[in-house]
Amino acid sequence: FEAGLISEEELEHIENVACPTCGSCSGMYTANTMNCLTEALGMALPGNGTIPAVYSERLRLAKRAGMQVMEVLQEGLRPKDVLTKEAFENAVAVDMALGGSSNTALHLPAIAHEAGVSLTLDDFNRIAGDTPQLAKLSPSGKYFIEDLHAAGGVYAVMHRLQEQGHLHESAKSVSLVDQ
């Protein structure tokens, strides 16, 4: 616009369609990747990774999550019970299957370190060499986080990976169901 290559109306149109609504962007950038991996780690309820911010389903999930916190506390499940080596390896496998942000190579080891778990780039390489990419999401593909949600979300990706033997089935989850 400043260079005079497009009109103010064209700029406004681009602004109106660039980000579909409130919430994170629609591509598999760092925010969406980490949100999906929070679910893959077992620290969020199914659906948390992909439900768009404006869907009423997001409000229902928030209510379920609040109720689930109480159940998790009653069961005595603690974050370190969930954040195990197996959980982090599952998250890396989901990351590879989704083609997530490369920033996970920084964020996941940092979270693992805080949980007392060693997660290295060698782990990423080992898991990446064995895990198929199941989704081609923006920016590397033509599909968006809403499309992943419509296709079953992180849960569907994890189910497919589990069928193929790429996940540790014994990993715990705040849903109180083993993944």
PLM region descriptions:
Residues 1-179:
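Catalytic or ion-coupling anion/metal-binding cores of large enzyme and transporter domains
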